Amino acid sequence: KQAKIEQIALLARAALAARNKVALKMNVPAAQLDPVVRLLPSLRAPTVSHLYDREWLALETVVDSERVRDLIPRLTAAGAQGILEYELKKIL
């Protein structure tokens, strides 16, 4: 019974942590990675992975939802493309 309560509490805390956050995913030319990353706050560090075209990278991060309106135009100006914004259910 105690384990079940702890499990529910963990999931509730995770849902509360995600309440004011969104995830951003974008494509970035490899040459523009540093300027784009410098704009991004994140929980730790953004996730970066190579696309099939090695001159491009996929970048994913979590940010405060209130910052997105100002952040997306700056990311675009720094070279990011194909920017996706999506809600989070939980952050553990």
What are these model-predicted stretches?
Residues 1-92:
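Small-molecule-sensing regulatory modules
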